[in-house]
């Protein structure tokens, strides 16, 4: 090879090297441009734009590609403003959106979080990349606490709670909180371990486990987790509910607790329990000091270690103490002694226990009781509740027979509300029987059963006898009163003779006369709208003989025809009066108005017609009310519900 050829070859090689080093316009390698991000939520429609806005003519021929593993997979073509999907996974979800080459991707899923490429060939070849970013908010986080508890003496980390956030995209971030403060990883104190699972839908399920060492002060701590995630609209977060974790620690102190709190009295439902500052509560025993031996003796409790005093009595008073045994540490703890006081009032006694006195004499009643507190006494009349006096002594002077009966002595403790005891005593006033009524009238229906009653009082308590046969029953409202009820058949003889009840005791006797009045049943006329009968009454008055008693009078019966005749007569009188006034008016003898006679045109007179209709729903016995006390008839307007139609 000659020298000229070597020189030429050298120059050619140098030119090639220089071209390669310096580059030639139009032949340099273009770097991949930064893709345009498009954010969309799962289930919505994403709009993929092919670069900046240009006239529609610039996109007469466009191709869309999916970038998958550095390969360009065609998915859509645009030619002359018309689009066509390529077969594949996007075949049925892509469409043109408006003029140009903007694609609408419907029903976005997490699998669509990819890079897309738009290639346009006019006016010059141009590539435009779009990065589709898909988001989905996770569900509300759930949290599960450790229910078995964590012992403070264990040195290794124990699981506190587990937080789960389901169906989010992309993977949310989890933050743990204790009492509102975020927890950070801390060696030998706090550890957070998170894992995620990809569901078939492409969504993520996040699981985070919080482990920690707890101390006694964490027994009331509130733990919860927070999920932080992003949406196209911005950053969001969701919090779980708060949970507490049982913290186990040994007891250091034990004490006695009594319910109810405050002053106790006999009859209360009292509960005694033992408590400690440890968790869980250890096994307890409740002991009470024996006042005789001064030794503590164990009391019987239920399965929960509760001692129930139901009802509390004065012998339940005393000194109580709790003891606890920690089975893990075998440490025995004892509480401070607690003195329980059950306030009481002993059985009330009245002296004399069965007082008896002659009418007109005086009587002194004395009430006694015992209590651990100061007492107050009150005297009441049992029958009426009337307060007779205060103090342990009740003095009754110049007693009357009405003073006989039961009295109450109430012994109470003012300092302990509701603590009182009562004693009843019956006072007997010597005397012959006295009757509730000397004479009574009872309405009866013949051949019907009737109850006759008789009441008498006295001391000694009287007995009652009847002068007629029947079934008698007795009861005693108080120790010196007796009430007898006799069930008899009303016969004509009984209506004629009546009945007598006699009360007698060792001091005398007394009688009540019962007069029977016959009640007749009256039926309304057939045109009446109702038919009413009068039932036989049972009369049992209890008014005293010296009081004014009012006997019920049955209305007298009167024929309904008399009422109708009275109405017709009154109607005729009114008609005649009206005709007379009209006659004087026509003759001009009756001035009309202040200006004298005025002409009034009346319709032609017709033959007078009187139509009288009387309607009444009154009972026959109520019709007797139409009759005055002197036998005069009342005006028709007072005779109940009726109307009169007068036609002229």
UniProtKB/Swiss-Prot annotation:
Gene Ontology CC annotations of this record: external side of plasma membrane; extracellular space; perikaryon; plasma membrane
Signal sequence, start to end: 1-23
Tissues with expression: Detected in lung, uterus and placenta (at protein level). Detected in heart, lung, kidney, adrenal gland, intestine, testis, skeletal muscle and aorta. Detected at low levels in adult brain, in particular in brain stem and spinal cord, but also in hippocampus, olfactory bulb and striatum (at protein level).
Keywords attached to this entry: Cell adhesion, Cell membrane, Disulfide bond, Glycoprotein, Immunoglobulin domain, Membrane, Phosphoprotein, Repeat, Signal, Transmembrane, Transmembrane helix
Source organism of the structure: Rattus norvegicus
Bias kind Polar residues: ranges: 527-549
Region (Disordered): 282-304, 527-554, 626-648
Extracellular side stretches: 24-560
Domain Ig-like V-type per the UniProt entry, residue ranges: 24-131, 141-244
A GO biological-process term: vascular wound healing
UniProt KW DNA repair keyword: no
Major location category of this protein: membrane
SUPFAM superfamilies linked: Immunoglobulin
PANTHER family, per the entry: CELL SURFACE GLYCOPROTEIN MUC18, CELL SURFACE GLYCOPROTEIN MUC18-RELATED
UniProt-recorded Gene Ontology molecular function terms: laminin receptor activity
Disulphide bonds in the chain: 50-118, 163-225, 274-322, 367-409, 454-501
Glycosylation, residue list: 58, 510
Cited Gene3D superfamilies: Immunoglobulins (2.60.40.10)
Chain positions found as Phosphoserine: 608, 616
Protein localization: Cell membrane; Perikaryon
The protein's name: Cell surface glycoprotein MUC18
Cytoplasmic topology ranges: 582-648
Domain Ig-like C2-type as annotated: residue spans: 246-332, 337-426, 432-512
Gene, per the UniProt record: Mcam
Taxonomy, superkingdom: Eukaryota
């Amino acid at each position: 090879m000659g020298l000229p050829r070597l020189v030429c070859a050298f120059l050619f090689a140098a030119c090639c090297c220089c071209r390669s080093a310096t580059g030639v316009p139009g032949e340099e390698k273009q770097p991949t441009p930064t893709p345009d991000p498009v954010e969309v939520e799962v289930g919505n429609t994403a709009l993929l734009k092919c670069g900046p806005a240009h006239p529609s003519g610039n996109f007469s021929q466009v191709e869309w590609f999916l970038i998958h593993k550095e390969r360009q997979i065609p998915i859509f073509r645009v030619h002359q403003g018309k689009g066509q999907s390529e077969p594949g996974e996007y075949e049925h979800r892509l469409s043109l959106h408006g003029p140009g080459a903007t694609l609408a991707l419907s029903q976005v899923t997490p699998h669509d979080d990819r890079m897309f490429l738009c290639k346009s060939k006019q006016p010059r070849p141009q590539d435009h990349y779009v990065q589709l970013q898909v988001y989905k908010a996770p569900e509300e986080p759930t949290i599960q606490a450790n229910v078995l508890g964590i012992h403070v003496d264990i040195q290794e980390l124990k699981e506190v709670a587990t937080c789960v956030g389901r169906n989010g995209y992309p993977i949310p971030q989890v933050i743990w909180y204790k009492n509102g403060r975020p927890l950070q990883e801390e060696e030998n104190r706090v550890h957070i371990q998170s894992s995620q699972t990809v569901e078939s839908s492409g969504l993520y399920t996040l699981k985070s486990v919080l482990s920690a060492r707890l101390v006694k002060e964490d027994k009331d701590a509130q733990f919860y987790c927070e999920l932080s995630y992003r949406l196209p609209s911005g950053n969001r977060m969701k919090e779980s509910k708060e949970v507490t974790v049982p913290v186990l620690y040994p007891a250091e102190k034990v004490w006695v607790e009594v319910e109810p709190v405050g002053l106790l009295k006999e009859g209360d439902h009292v509960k005694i329990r033992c408590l400690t500052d440890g968790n869980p509560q250890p096994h307890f025993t409740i002991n009470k000091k024996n006042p005789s031996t001064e030794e503590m003796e164990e009391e019987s409790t239920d399965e929960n270690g509760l001692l129930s005093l139901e009802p509390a009595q004065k012998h339940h008073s005393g000194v109580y103490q709790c003891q606890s045994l920690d089975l893990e540490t075998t440490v025995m703890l004892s509480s401070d002694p607690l003195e329980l006081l059950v306030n009481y009032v002993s059985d009330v006694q009245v002296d004399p226990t069965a007082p008896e006195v002659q009418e007109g004499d005086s009587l002194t009643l004395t009430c006694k009781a015992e209590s651990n507190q100061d007492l107050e006494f009150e005297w009441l009349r049992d029958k009426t509740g009337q307060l007779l006096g205060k103090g342990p002594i009740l003095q009754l002077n110049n007693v009357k027979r009405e003073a006989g009966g039961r009295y109450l002595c109430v012994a109470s403790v003012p300092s302990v509300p509701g603590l009182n005891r009562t004693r009843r005593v019956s006072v007997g006033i010597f005397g012959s029987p006295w009757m509730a009524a000397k004479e009574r009238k009872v309405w009866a229906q013949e051949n019907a059963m009737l109850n006759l009653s008789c009441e008498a009082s006295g001391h000694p308590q009287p007995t009652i006898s009847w002068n007629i046969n029947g079934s008698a029953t007795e009861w005693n409202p108080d120790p010196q009163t007796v009430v007898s009820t006799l069930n008899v058949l009303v016969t004509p003889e009984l209506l004629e003779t009546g009945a007598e009840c006699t009360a007698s005791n060792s001091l005398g006797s007394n009688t009540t006369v019962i007069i029977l009045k016959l009640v007749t049943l009256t039926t309304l006329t057939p045109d009446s709208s109702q038919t009413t009968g009068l039932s036989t009454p049972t009369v049992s008055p209890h008014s005293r003989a010296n009081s004014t008693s009012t006997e019920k009078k049955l209305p007298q019966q009167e024929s309904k025809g008399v009422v109708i005749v009275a109405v017709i007569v009154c109607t005729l009188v009114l008609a005649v009066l009206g005709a007379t006034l009209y006659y004087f008016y026509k003759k001009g003898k009756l001035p009309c108005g202040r200006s004298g006679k005025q002409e009034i045109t009346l319709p032609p007179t017709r033959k007078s017609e009187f139509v009288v209709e009387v309607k009444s729903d009154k009972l026959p016995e109520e019709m007797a009310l139409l009759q005055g006390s002197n036998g005069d008839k009342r005006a028709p307007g007072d005779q109940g519900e009726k109307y009169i139609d007068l036609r002229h």
